[in-house]
């Protein structure tokens, strides 16, 4: 709030609960545990809050500036002495109509390691204070995606290449940009193309790179929440790369997906 002004209430999502025990009881049988020795925690937690004063319209949709973070116990050694806690924090633009996050690389911290709450506060403040929303530049970049059309034939080529990429030798994969998703997510992109009420194909119209971004963002929503941020940023980078290739400005190998 000190950086961005008034925020909406924090929204949280947790993964499945883990029934555990306190460290001093780790060698007991489950049947021998007293109630005060049992613990319950959620392996992963994600939270977001929206900046009330930064809402824009992009391609007919409301877009909010959003901050948030992820904490995953799966990255920590819970039964050892105190070690650094691992967090991920981000700032990004969220498409309000379907909760898709259009995350750009200037607002993602990656993994940060902290020993105290003061460390967390300091590192989060460093990211938030250094973040420039680039409202015109970033949103202009996203809005411009609508100006690059993708025919059904071309969409099918991209989908086919996404499937093919997964089976290429590692040596070939290293030379190509990637969208880090599996078959299930690729299928979800196709489903979005066919039936998404907001971004799906409409009779007599071509889709655009903006639609492609929404299919990809929607597809990675089912990823574990501690992996979702990297995948979401990857979606944005991938579609921007596809657009450059379509406009003849490819420098990173995205033309492979169009051939």
Task: List each model region and its residues.
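Intrinsically disordered, low-complexity regions enriched in serine/threonine
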Residues: 5-259
């Amino acid at each position: 709030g000190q950086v961005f002004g008034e925020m909406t209430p924090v929204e949280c999502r947790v993964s499945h609960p883990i029934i555990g025990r306190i460290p001093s009881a780790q060698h007991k049988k489950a049947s021998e545990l007293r109630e005060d020795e049992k613990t319950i925690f959620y392996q992963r937690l994600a939270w977001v809050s929206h900046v009330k004063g930064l809402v824009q319209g992009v391609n007919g949709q409301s877009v909010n500036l959003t901050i948030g973070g992820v904490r995953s116990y799966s990255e920590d050694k819970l039964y050892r002495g105190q070690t650094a806690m691992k967090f991920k924090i981000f700032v990004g633009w969220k498409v309000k109509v379907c909760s898709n996050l259009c995350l750009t690389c200037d607002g993602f911290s990656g993994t940060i390691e902290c020993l105290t709450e003061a460390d967390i506060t300091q590192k989060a403040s460093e990211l938030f204070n250094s973040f420039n929303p680039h409202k015109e530049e970033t949103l202009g970049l996203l809005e411009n995606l609508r100006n690059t059309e993708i025919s059904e034939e071309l969409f099918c080529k991209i989908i086919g290449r996404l499937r093919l990429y997964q089976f290429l030798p590692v040596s070939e994969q290293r030379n190509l940009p990637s969208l880090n998703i599996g078959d299930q997510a690729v299928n979800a992109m196709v489903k979005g193309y066919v039936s998404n009420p907001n971004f799906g194909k409409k009779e007599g119209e071509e889709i655009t790179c903006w639609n492609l971004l929404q299919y990809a963002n929607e597809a990675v929503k089912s990823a574990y929440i501690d992996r979702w941020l990297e995948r979401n940023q990857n979606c944005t980078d991938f579609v921007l790369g596809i657009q450059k290739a379509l406009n003849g400005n490819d420098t990173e190998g995205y033309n492979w997906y169009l051939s």
